[in-house]
Amino acid sequence: MGPGLAASHVSFPDSLLAKMRDLLQYVACFFAFFSAGFLVVATWTDCWMVNADDSLEVSTKCRGLWWECVTNAFDGIRTCDEYDSILAEHSLKLVVTRALMITADILAGFGFITLLLGLDCVKFLPDEPYIKVRISFVAGTTLLIAGAPGIIGSVWYAVDVYVERSSLVLHNIFLGIQYKFGWSCWLGMAGSLGCFLAGAILTCCLYLFKDVGPERSYPYSTRKAYSTTAVSMPRSHAIPRTQTAKMYAVDTRV
């Protein structure tokens, strides 16, 4: 009764910590899903720059990484013009932001798919929990890396828009239209921060639970059972030899 009670006290914290680890994986999966979606939507939408409220325009003009759209304020008609070929000359801000956001999209998508394979509810390597934890760790590292180009591209674009507008105001130059960064830029920042958060959960928090669960107890119990058997065998043979030796010693004395 004593050993069984002790075993129940030992297994209860392990099961609780294992549930906490699974919960962290699901929370990270939630953030990774929406972060990857935000990055993809931000890359392929047209509202990275939008005309400010103090502009003398009767229409809303948005500029994205690939095209520019104008929406008439009276009838709501929307027209879009694509930029020139990707091989044409573009501003450094546009080219670098494109490259950074596409890189972030690919890495975030790969990290999310990898994380799905590491979840316990997914029937992938069900008998290898240690490998699944490793897969989740790789997914977290990938998401951390994905957040870097995303946040660099989004913040650089936003800062460039702000500096351009501030320079015009500082020099009293008014062109009739002024831009501010739009919701696509905000979406890129949010997606990048979400990737950082998901990656931090998977790498830092799961590291604290790396010794919890069946991936730890199974090898240890196997080694313990093997060592107990190996030790008990010599003892069982040692008892008859010792008694025989004592009897032989008594006979010789007599």
Swiss-Prot record:
It comes from the Eukaryota. The keyword Magnesium applies. GO terms for molecular function: identical protein binding; paracellular tight junction channel activity; PDZ domain binding; structural molecule activity. A motif (Interaction with TJP1) lies at residues 252-254. GO terms for cellular component: bicellular tight junction; plasma membrane; tight junction. Keywords: Cell junction, Cell membrane, Ion transport, Magnesium, Membrane, Tight junction, Transmembrane, Transmembrane helix, Transport. The chain crosses the membrane at residues 23-43, 99-119, 135-155, 189-209. Expressed preferentially in kidney. It catalyses: Mg(2+)(in) = Mg(2+)(out); Ca(2+)(in) = Ca(2+)(out); Na(+)(in) = Na(+)(out); K(+)(in) = K(+)(out). It is a multi-pass membrane protein. It holds the Pfam family PMP22_Claudin. InterPro entries: Claudin, Claudin16, Claudin_CS, PMP22/EMP/MP20/Claudin. GO terms for biological process: bicellular tight junction assembly; calcium-independent cell-cell adhesion via plasma membrane cell-adhesion molecules; cell adhesion; monoatomic ion transport; paracellular transport; renal absorption. It is found in: Cell junction, Tight junction; Cell membrane. Residues 1-22, 120-134, 210-254 are cytoplasmic. The keyword tRNA-binding does not apply. Residues 44-98, 156-188 are extracellular. Its main location: other. It is linked to Defects in CLDN16 are a cause of an autosomal recessive chronic interstitial nephritis with diffuse zonal fibrosis (CINF). CINF is characterized by increased blood urea nitrogen, creatinine, and urinary proteins, leads to lethality before puberty, usually within the first 6 months or year of life. Forms paracellular channels: coassembles with CLDN19 into tight junction strands with cation-selective channels through the strands, conveying epithelial permeability in a process known as paracellular tight junction permeability. Involved in the maintenance of ion gradients along the nephron. In the thick ascending limb (TAL) of Henle's loop, facilitates sodium paracellular permeability from the interstitial compartment to the lumen, contributing to the lumen-positive transepithelial potential that drives paracellular magnesium and calcium reabsorption. Belongs to the claudin family. The first extracellular loop contains negatively charged amino acids that affect cation selectivity. Can form heteropolymeric tight junction strands with other claudins. Interacts with CLDN19. Interacts (via PDZ-binding motif TRV) with TJP1 (via PDZ domain). Cannot form tight junction strands on its own. This is Claudin-16. It comes from Bos taurus. The lineage of its organism: Eukaryota, Metazoa, Chordata, Craniata, Vertebrata.
